């Protein structure tokens, strides 16, 4: 059975390491903030100038002036800091962010990423995605395995405008987790009840299964 959006976010939260500086992309990746594992202290950064994002606020905690880059209201943890977008992008471009968890429309088995534009459709635009994939130390994609019409999102080549070439390190979907390697995709984990036959049918490229040592 496919993971729910919250289960996907919880799985992505397992990628977080203690003391890391992390940027969460708009959309599904923002849910990761609600699933940070106990004992893991991370600093979540947003392009609009906030370091130290906390979980999403409850109804009595909403501050309309405190938002992330996707214009969602957020909370700030103790020790959070606020600054201009020029400083925020300097952190990103300077290689000071350890991990970015981003959404995607298409990804290839070589780690190419398309996540900012669909021709003919209104989308929020590029935002900081190109800066993130160029400057962050590790990039994880969090997305549904296939599009709403059932077409593949993991492909040999993106047909949407690219955000970056060879930039993705790991892909987490509602069905599985893949590592992007020089030899292509390696299946690391599958959601409970999801078999290889289903994965191969819903993945637009070949992959190998990680061997357990």
Curated annotation (Swiss-Prot):
What Pfam families does the annotation carry? CoA_trans
Q: Where is the active site?
A: 47
Q: Name one GO biological process term.
A: lipopolysaccharide biosynthetic process
Q: EC?
A: 2.8.3.5
Q: Does the keyword Transferase apply?
A: yes
Specify the superkingdom: Bacteria
Q: What reaction does this catalyse?
A: a 3-oxo acid + succinyl-CoA = a 3-oxoacyl-CoA + succinate
Task: Identify the metabolic or biological route this protein is part of.
Answer: Bacterial outer membrane biogenesis; lipopolysaccharide biosynthesis
State one molecular function term (GO): succinyl-CoA:3-oxo-acid CoA-transferase activity
**What Gene3D superfamilies has UniProt attached to this entry?**
Glutaconate Coenzyme A-transferase (3.40.1080.10)
Question: Which EC class, in a word?
Answer: transferase
Q: Which UniProt keywords apply?
A: Lipopolysaccharide biosynthesis, Transferase
Q: Tell me its family.
A: Belongs to the 3-oxoacid CoA-transferase subunit B family.
Spell out the subunit comment: Heterodimer of a subunit A and a subunit B.
Task: Report the protein name in the record.
Answer: Succinyl-CoA:3-ketoacid coenzyme A transferase subunit B
This chain's source organism reads Xanthomonas campestris pv. campestris (strain B100)
Q: Report which gene this protein is encoded by.
A: lpsJ
């Amino acid at each position: 059975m496919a993971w729910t959006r919250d289960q996907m976010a919880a799985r992505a939260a397992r990628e977080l390491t203690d003391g890391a500086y992390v940027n969460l992309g708009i959309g599904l990746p923002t849910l990761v903030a609600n699933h940070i594992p106990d004992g893991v202290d991370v600093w979540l950064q947003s392009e609009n100038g906030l370091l130290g994002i906390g979980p999403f606020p409850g109804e009595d905690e909403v501050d309309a002036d405190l938002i992330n880059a996707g214009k969602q209201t957020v909370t700030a943890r103790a020790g959070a800091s606020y600054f201009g977008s020029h400083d925020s992008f300097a952190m990103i471009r300077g290689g000071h962010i350890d991990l970015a968890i981003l959404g995607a429309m298409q990804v290839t088995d070589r780690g190419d990423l398309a996540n900012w534009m669909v021709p003919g459709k209104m989308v929020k635009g590029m935002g900081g995605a190109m800066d993130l994939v160029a400057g962050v130390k590790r990039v994880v994609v969090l997305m549904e395995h296939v599009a709403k019409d059932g077409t593949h999102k993991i492909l040999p080549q993106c047909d949407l405008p690219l955000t970056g070439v060879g930039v993705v390190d790991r892909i987490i979907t509602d069905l599985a987790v893949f590592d992007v390697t020089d030899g292509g995709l390696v299946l690391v984990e599958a959601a409970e009840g999801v078999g290889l036959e289903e994965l191969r049918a819903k993945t637009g490229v070949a992959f190998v299964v990680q061997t357990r040592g």
